Swiss-Prot record:
Subcellular location: Cytoplasm; Secreted; Cell surface
The protein's name in its UniProt record: Enolase
Cofactor note (record): Binds a second Mg(2+) ion via substrate during catalysis.
UniProt cross-references to Gene3D superfamilies, sorted A to Z: Enolase-like C-terminal domain, Enolase-like, N-terminal domain
Cofactor: Mg(2+)
Amino acid sequence: MSTIAAVWAREILDSRGNPTVEVEVTLESGASGRAAVPSGASTGSREALEMRDQDASRYAGKGVTKAVENVQGELADTVIGMDALQQVAIDNLMIDTDGTENKSRLGANAILGVSLAVCRAASNFLGLPLYQYIGGINSKVLPVPMMNIINGGAHAPNNLDIQEFMIIPLGARTFADALRMGAETFHTLKKILAADGHMTAVGDEGGFAPNLKSHDEAFKYIIKAIEESGYRPGSEISLAIDAAASEFYKNGKYVLTGENLSLSSTEMVDYLGGFVERYPLISIEDGLAESDWPGWKTLTLNLGERIQLVGDDIFVTNPDILAEGIDQGVANSILIKLNQIGTVTETLDTIEMAKQAAYTTVVSHRSGETEDSFIADLSVAVNAGQIKTGSLCRSDRLAKYNQLLRIEEELEDMAIYYGPVMAGQWYEEEPEGDEE
């Protein structure tokens, strides 16, 4: 029987050493599912609310024992006896039980933990791979990895305001090839940085965190690493950034401390456009602040036909907010983070809405991750085509990459790597590098 028989939760630690929630769901058949919930560093103000204990005597107030109690108490009472195959009904009932718009009463981390664990238990009950259980027999697209190899902003203690500099191996034939290309470039970059006297310590997501003179210098180092690894910048490996602009948006200005700049929305759009002109940059995430909707419209009008503009903090995986963005012509892509909305069902609804509006979708990790690889299966399940799950070190990031290798192997000839499709969407010609 696929009836839920037991629900258990515990407090575990994430990749930053902070507590998070892990949930186990057991069915009457004996099948079970386990899931751990991630946590972000730069978060959107409209995200579903994770519950923390606020007890300064434990984990600096970041404990999650209250969320664990909510799983084992009210949420367990809600879902025990329900059919694990009825994911939508289970998720909706948990939302109703919480009764708040942002899941703040029981905690989004508690609700999501149960939602993910139920999904895994159901797939195990049916003996199906998780990606196939969620997406069906047409789930066969392996995502292009957006690999974060230089960290800044809230993810690293350095002078870079832009949070993530990423490489995108468009020219690979398979996901396995893409992973190899990324790893080779990552290790080459490490050697180049070290040779120039930079520290090669890594940030929260496994990218290097050097102090550099400017954002342009970061781009130049990455392009040099791509070339010295034997690849062509642009056609084989393109670039992407996550500006996380909400983090440096103050009093209506974009304050780039590392470059001593204070920019208006229009100036920030021009600043980002300069990168597009100088480098093979095909994707910008959160180029403007979540509250700067007029600026986002300008950004989309100026660059939306040329590159991918990904909304993270502005949309927070929320279908209602995404609908506003679609209506107003804001962005052309959405980042998908399970814990921003708090259930599997709502996440899938958001992805479907994005696809109907011809927005691209990027399934994403958080900076505080665990060894849980759910998002790897999710990216294939929905044929997202892109995944953001960090750099080429730290096992919390590699757990997702390694799961995608297994999925590609399992799909055999049916597997389709999304790189050529993405290249056709956004890559036209190789811009000339900045020679200064």
